[in-house]
Amino acid sequence: MRVAVDGEAMQDAHGFMAKLRGSAPVCPVSEARQPAAALVTRYEDVRALLADGRVRHDVRSKAEREAAAERRELTPREELMYWALGGSMIYRDPPDHTRLRRLVNQAFTPRAVERLRPRLSAVADELVAAFAPGATVDLVGEFAVPLTTLAICELLGIPQDGRGAFWGWAQAINDAEAGDGYYEALAEAVEYLSALIERKRVNPGTDLLSELIAVSDEDGDRLSADELVATSLLLLIAGHDTSVHLIANAVLCLLTSPDQLAALRADPSLVDNVVEEVLRYESPVNILPTRFAGSSIELAGGTIPEGETVLLSVLSANRDESVFPDPDRFDITRSAAGHLAFGHGIHYCPGAPLARLEGRLAVAALITGSPHLRLAVAPDELR
C-alpha cells in the first residue's frame, strides 16, 4: 500500500515526515507527479543516497525506456520537458554531469556571486525604505520577489524588459498542479532564453550567461545551445523560487520566535547563523528533484526496486533528532552545519552561495530598516 503525499499530508509536513522517520523511513508513496515512488526521510539515509552512484538522475533516459516498454513515443509536452530540463547537470549522471559541472564552475564562481553584493544590498535597503510606516506589507510580493528577481536577472544578464515574466515562469514551472500553465511557462521561458543566448553570442556582456557561452575546457569543449538553455532554466527555477522561500521563512521564523529575534537585534553578526538555521529548520525545498534507482537498493530494512523513483526529503532529514538535538526548536545560536538544504555530494547545489548571500542581505536589511516589523495576521492564517 502506498501512502499519498498530497496537500492534506503536507498541511503538517513536519508532523507527517516525523511519523515516517519513526515507522517507515523508506516508504512507498504516491504524489502528484510520481504515482509510484519511495520516500526517504531519515538524515543518514538521505545523505547516503545523495552520494550513492546507484541513485540516478537521467530522468529523460528513464522516461524513454518506459515509453518504449509501452510501445509509444514521448508526447510533445514530454519532449519539451525532458529537453528543457534534462539538459542541465541536475538531471545528468557522470560522466556527462562531471563535464557540465566542470564547465559551469568556470563561470559560476564565488567571485561572480560576490560582485552582486553592493547592488543587492542597496536594493534590499531601498525596498525596505519604501514600506509605508504602519502599513501592511506583502513581504513576498513587495520584498522577496523583487530582490531575488533582480539577483538572478543581474547574474544572468537579463535585460530590463524581460524581467517581468520571470517570477511567473518560475512559479508555474515549480507548481506540481499548474497543468497547462506548466508547459506554457516552460515553452515561453525556453523561447526567451534561446533568443537571448543567440544575442549574447554576438554582443557578450560581463554577466554569467555571456561567460557560460564563452567557457571552454582544455580540449576546447563548450556548452551547447541546449545545455545553455537548460542551465539558465535551472538557475531560474531552482534558484529563484528557493531564495524567495528562504527569505520568507527567515522572517516568519524570527517573528514567531521573539527571543531569537531579540538575540539577532542584540548581535547582528548572528545573521549568518540565522540563515543556516532557517535552512535547517524550515528548508525551502521539501523533496529534492526526481531521482530513480539504477539498481535495487537495500536501505533501512527495506528495498527500493530498480527503476523506482526515489524522493529524498531534506525537510525531514534536517529535523532528524538523531542528528540535531531538539530539532523542532528554532535556535540561531546552534551550529546547523551539516544540514542538507542544498543537497550533498556531486550534485550539491551550485547556487548555494547566491542563496546564502540573498538571505543574509535580506534579513540584515529588514532588521535594520524595520525595527517594528511584526506579522499582520496570525501564523496559522499564512499559506
Describe the predicted segments one by one:
Residues 1-383:
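Cytochrome P450
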